[in-house]
């Protein structure tokens, strides 16, 4: 993959702050008594470091070297094992909990997605829990992402002008193209990501094929039931 510009990485936590998704995961970790946790697609580690506590092993895996460099520099960064890679690089062991937040699941294309589920299933102990979310394709969130006009904000590197474009690549597949112009230097950074929107039925089928049992499907981080109009598909599944 083409890695992220470090100047954009430095803005990630402001754009994706700690919120109800992270609170949900922390509650779940306590609920299941997790002593070992794997955060797949951990990014800057904003959630990962909050899961680490005395006697608990926490591992963060991400394919972005720039994201991991930021994560390692966190004051609490030495409390986590950081691994550059994807699900194939999950270390041996029987984890109690695996998490994927910030719609990480949508960044993994087929068939790598099915392999990812199999890899996570293998890494969990019997009864170990997997939780992740994906945007509900029925809501068509991508239609709200196109910027009618560029916006500008101040950063540590000066004024940053931003706008977004999308391309529909097929059923449930969207390319998000983010333009970032650092006005002081004129440097134009373009970051492109392909997102896969999977519906509830497809997600459950893929989990079953990987050996998981689906315990719950929520439509929001407050634990409310999933409906066809829910913004998210939040899945809690277990090995065995």
Which residue ranges define each predicted feature?
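Class I SAM-dependent methyltransferase SAM/SAH-binding core
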Residues: 46-89
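A short acidic, Gly/Pro-enriched loop at the edge of an enzyme's catalytic core
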Residues: 90-97
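A short glycine-rich, Lys/Arg-flanked "PGG" loop and its adjoining helix->strand segment in the class I
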Residues: 114-126
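Conserved beta-strand signature within the Rossmann-like core of class I S-adenosyl-L-methionine
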Residues: 127-134
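C-terminal lobe and adjacent flexible extensions of AdoMet/dcAdoMet transferase-like proteins
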Residues: 198-240
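SAM-dependent methyltransferase
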Residues: 134-204
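Conserved class I S-adenosyl-L-methionine
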Residues: 1-35
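Class I SAM-dependent methyltransferase "Motif I" SAM/SAH-binding loop
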Residues: 41-43
